[in-house]
């Protein structure tokens, strides 16, 4: 009986490893992205599970392996991560961010950056995957004073 209780406790901890707000934050980013796109005359993006898996995998890798960049530690670029999920695309783009504790914060920074804004407002892109991973025991990245703790990834694609 004790073994079963320990298993249940471990399963519960695994479920709680990601904050409850993570899904809500991703939904908030999607809503904000689509609001910005509507203002630019672009169609709304739709969520795609394969793109979301690619985004989550990279956000998780950055958080757990303590790095920040479009290329994974093994050198894989976002296009490779998207292909690995079985998604066939004609065009792709990626936005990453770290340190922002809210959807509003990450959107403010992305929209203030010319390259990130360009990806958000690219009317040729029609699908997206969004992920945020929270690493409570994160360590500061090399050259940084404070830990980022929040790692954001949004991938954009056109099939």
Question: Where does each model-flagged region fall?
Answer:
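Short, surface-exposed glycine/acidic/tryptophan-bearing loops
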Residues: 50-101, 120-122
